[in-house]
């Protein structure tokens, strides 16, 4: 098993080197939109609220990285703008946790947004897919698929 993981990791590194692009897991979904960060961020917030869920928190990742850069000896600016919106849905959260109590790990649900200094005007919006272990059964898989559809809908709405 370790040998297979090592081969897989080596393939990912080679692929990333050859393409010059990061290799993302299929568990991270990203969409791109040209525009201003503030406009797309506004649309993302509206898309979350339109689903009827309660926003629990919002974070400014770019600000946090800037604020802590000196503390960790960082000299690179990763993002021009970056943030997240965390939210809960009584319907979807309950279905996830009724299927398996361990699914609490997926709550709250989070969508992210960022713009890098290298590609101004290219706004990335995305989310991490709620992928449950296969041994959790069909109820967890269905609940996770429903949450995935909700997150996909929010992101699609923000970038249309």
Which stretches of residues belong to each language-model region?
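Sec/Tat-exported extracytoplasmic proteins
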Residues: 44, 51-55, 69, 151, ...
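Solvent-exposed, acidic/flexible segments
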Residues: 33-41, 58, 78, 137-140, ...
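C-terminal partner/receptor-binding element of secreted or periplasmic proteins
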Residues: 125-160
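Bacterial N-terminal signal peptides that target proteins for export
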Residues: 1-11
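A short, structured loop/turn motif at beta-sheet edges
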Residues: 114-121
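Bacterial N-terminal signal peptides
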Residues: 10-20
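Mid-chain, structured segments of secreted extracytoplasmic proteins
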Residues: 63-110
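Terminal, regulation- and interaction-focused segments at domain boundaries
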Residues: 24-52, 57-59
């Amino acid at each position: 098993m370790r040998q297979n993981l090592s081969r897989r990791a080596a393939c990912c590194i080679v692929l990333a080197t050859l393409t010059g692009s990061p290799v993302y897991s299929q568990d991270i979904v990203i969409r791109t939109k040209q525009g201003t960060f503030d406009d797309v961020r506004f649309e993302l917030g509206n898309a979350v609220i339109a689903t009827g869920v309660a926003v629990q928190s919002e974070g400014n990742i770019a600000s946090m990285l800037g604020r802590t850069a000196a503390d960790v000896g960082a000299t690179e600016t990763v993002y021009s703008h970056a943030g997240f919106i965390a939210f809960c849905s009584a319907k979807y959260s309950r279905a996830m946790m009724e299927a398996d109590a361990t699914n609490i790990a997926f709550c709250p649900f989070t969508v992210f947004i960022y713009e890098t200094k290298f590609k101004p005007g290219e706004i990335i919006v995305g989310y991490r897919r709620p992928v449950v272990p296969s041994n959790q059964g069909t109820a967890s898989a269905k609940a996770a698929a429903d949450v995935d559809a909700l997150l996909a809908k929010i992101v699609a709405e923000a970038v249309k």
